[in-house]
């Protein structure tokens, strides 16, 4: 398994690429659209996007990854918030969210993604 922290420009979110096979990636909190090109530079295909939360500064690259075939996963609570922050986006000059959640997960639930076992741990607050 390889985990790479990506340092975006502008809004600083903790974006990560995680891969078990060196070909398919799970992307955590893709803050910016350029995340798609950074994956391509590493010859990684975006298979899944995991969102820790749906604030605009963590989801800027989700639309591009979803259009490329990545499945978007987040908690049920965050799935309800997707697309509801247009005024906050406008205030910070960020485009509004244009994606949807493909799957949701619950606290403590484990999923297998690209050969990786991922367990959700809720940390509200």
Language-model segments: residues:
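Core dinuclear metal-dependent hydrolase active-site scaffold
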Residues: 2-3, 17-19, 108-125
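Active-site HxH/HxHxD metal-binding segment of metal-dependent hydrolases
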Residues: 12, 32-114
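Active-site flanking residues adjacent to catalytic metal/cofactor-binding acidic residues
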Residues: 28, 52, 121
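Short Gly/Pro-enriched turn/cap motifs at secondary-structure boundaries
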Residues: 6-8, 94, 100-102, 121-124
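Conserved beta-strand hairpin/beta-sheet module of binuclear metal-dependent hydrolase folds
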Residues: 1-44
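Structural motif
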Residues: 24-26, 48, 116
């Amino acid at each position: 398994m390889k985990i790479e922290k990506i340092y975006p420009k502008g809004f600083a979110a903790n974006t990560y690429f995680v891969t078990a096979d060196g070909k398919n990636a799970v992307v955590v909190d893709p803050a910016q659209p350029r995340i798609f090109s950074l994956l391509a530079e590493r010859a990684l295909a975006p298979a899944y996007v995991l969102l820790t939360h749906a604030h605009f500064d963590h989801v800027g690259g989700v639309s591009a990854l979803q259009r490329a075939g990545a499945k978007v996963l987040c908690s049920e609570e965050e799935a309800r918030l997707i697309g509801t922050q247009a005024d906050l986006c406008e205030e910070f000059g960020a485009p509004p969210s244009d994606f949807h959640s493909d799957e949701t997960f619950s606290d403590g639930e484990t999923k297998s993604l690209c050969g990786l076992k991922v367990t959700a741990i809720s940390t509200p607050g």
